[in-house]
Amino acid sequence: LKFNVTATESEVVYGANDTYVNSQGALISAASLFANGRDTRLQGQSDLIGNIQFGWDDLQNGSQATFIVNYVSDRVRARGIDVLPDVIEEPPLLVDFVYSKEIYYDTSSLKLSLELRNLLDEEYYAAMASSVIYDQYKLGSSVSLGFKFSF
């Protein structure tokens, strides 16, 4: 069993006189870039990330199985322009299962593998101010079968 949890708190910090130069050479106040003012998170930074991996290895029979859960809290996907709010994305909870079995015969081996990804088939969602949908779609689940023969 392996797991990790990362909690962060991020913010954008700028001074009253901080500016940036746009592609036309104009000086623009940093304060005008953030509709939420100083109380805004870094773009792409989740406050909480968690991963759990439960694995099983049977060395005598050449079998491995792993169950994986990945969680990422909501985060700023894109900054709002002028008075528009930031686009906040809610990444889906991802649950995967991976199994492999290696069969030995004389000097050869056959490895069979099965991967089941995104078992919950949750949808990806991003919105402005929780009401204007920016992106919404299902990621879809996937199944992979693998065969590897060594001689």
Language-model features, listed with the residues they occupy:
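Membrane-embedded beta-strands of outer-membrane beta-barrel proteins
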Residues: I52-F54, A65, F97-Y99, L145-F147
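Residues that define the transmembrane beta-barrel architecture of outer-membrane proteins
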Residues: S46-G50, P91-V95, L139-V143
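C-terminal beta-signal and adjacent terminal beta-strands/loops
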Residues: Q60, N70-R79, K101-F151
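Short, well-ordered coil↔helix boundary/capping segments
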Residues: D86-L94, Y104
